[in-house]
Amino acid sequence: DALPICWNLREKEEKQILENRAKGIDERVSLRSRYVKILRNDINYIDLKEIRTYPFWNQRSNRSGLIAEERNARKKPFGNLANRTVGSVYKDIEKGGASGLELKYDSLLRGVPGVKYRQKIQGKWMDVVEEPAKEGWDIVTTIDADIQDIAERALNRKLVETEAESGTAIIMEVKTGEIKGMVNLDRMSNGNYAEGNPNAFSYMNEPGSTFKTVSTMIALDDGVVTPTDSFYVGTGLYQYNKRWVRDHYWRRGQDRGYLTITEGMELSSNIVMSKMVLKGYEDKPEKFIDGIDRIGLRKQLTWDVPLNGIEGTSAIRYPNDKNNYWSKTTLPWMSFGYETQIPPIYMLMFYNGIANGGKMIKPFIAKKFVENGK
């Protein structure tokens, strides 16, 4: 194996000599020195790993004589793409990951420190490795760079257009749960949008009309209604317990009469939703919450992205819970997505379950963990 190894090194060295001459540099190495520089100063880590697999040089430095002066630098080949998801590390390497995947899987990524001492060579102090450090694992993510780029640009345009404070976009593979792109943008102090908090997992927000599908599925599953059952909506105003439920067209004064469950979904009718759940659960609201539990929207889940102390679990009240007040209007308002707080990732998981034929899959970002390239 010696001939191809030496030839490989010769090619690398000749290439560097030509590059140096093109820059007007003519470096000469003293053959009388005990140590000889065999490669350029800035070979990458992949090449160094390859060299250390060669016979003789795969031993400790005190046996092989191979001394490599390492310089650590963090590089982002895709710039700020998926910056928050990938995460960051502290300037102090000992502290490890600071956010994102870097923080979540810090114990795997950081590896095990080695042992080295410093020796003066040709008037210059150099690090000599006594016990090589053990490399950390590599993470293969589900993120598709092209999809991520498109998602970031699209979300940024929409936020600028609507002058919103923040926004989240998530693209998920239906069958597998792989997140192909995820963007969390917040408005910064300068007015521009940039990656901020992991809102996809932690932003507690009322889901609004997206929750109407949940209410309808529970009522259908419990046999409370059928798709053809109808409720009177009139001009879009319905009073319950001295509070008004309004449909979006109520200002027009148009009398729509009765709407079926199907029509109520098509028109996103708050009145149909509220009357539907009151019919089935007014006297036993806990049964409606049990239906939410069957779907899994109150289940506490862990994610690939650390939430800085925020659990990111849905805040959906339960009747008779002394810590959370349950009023007479909680149930009907909950039916159309109010009086609940659900992170976006939960609603994504729910709708993905519908697209996946009823099978709900937990979204994930870390696809594979690789040790030593395997």
Where are these regions (language model features)?
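Amphipathic, well-packed alpha-helical segments that form the structural scaffold of globular domains
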Residues: D106, R110-P113, I121-Q122, V140, ...
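Conserved, well-ordered alpha-helix/loop/beta-strand core segments that scaffold catalytic motifs
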Residues: V36, K124-G167
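Beta-lactam-recognizing serine transpeptidase/beta-lactamase-like catalytic domain environment
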Residues: A2, R118-E130, I143, A169-G208, ...
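Small/polar-residue-rich segments within soluble enzyme cores
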Residues: P4-E135
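Envelope-exposed proteins and targeting segments
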Residues: Y35, S64, L81-R84, E135-I139, ...
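Soluble periplasmic/extracytoplasmic beta-strand elements of cell-envelope proteins
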Residues: I38-R40, I67, R84-S88, V140-T142, ...
